[in-house]
Amino acid sequence: MKKFRQIDEGLTWVLEAKSVDDQVGRLKDWASSTQCLVPVVRIGVGAEKVDFGIPEGMPATVKIKEDIPEGMGNTTINLEWRRISGFINPDAPIHNISQARRESVWVQILEGLHHAEAKVLTAVKDGKLLDIYPKLEKMLPTLGITEYNKPKAKRKPKAKKEK
């Protein structure tokens, strides 16, 4: 069983497997040792609709240090899961405080994470995990996830016709 400090490292490892069955096997193996992986994937792909009560995207006030090496963030999504799950549960006390204070707590969580994990957590909050990890989409039917936020297809600009 492989263990990872950061979610982004684990997802990269899962998606390095050649076949979808191997990827699913890796994901299930990893999920058996971490409580937050299943909700992160389900919410991140949009299989579960959750209102975090936070505006979409990375907050403008967040100060994330991009020069920190892998695995060297102050904390991780795993360690912060109790605080993050407060945003997911609609009955949690975090929803009883002002919007500004709630956003401040969210910024504190993001600033403690490694920059790669902060981007993953923001994508999870917005239901756009497939934008960061598009290979994850092939695994979803095998995992029993049929309804999710399909990523927008990137179109190539049409070539201009010459006269």
PLM ranges: what are they?
Residues 1-163:
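N-terminal nucleic-acid-engaging modules of covalent nucleotidyltransferase systems
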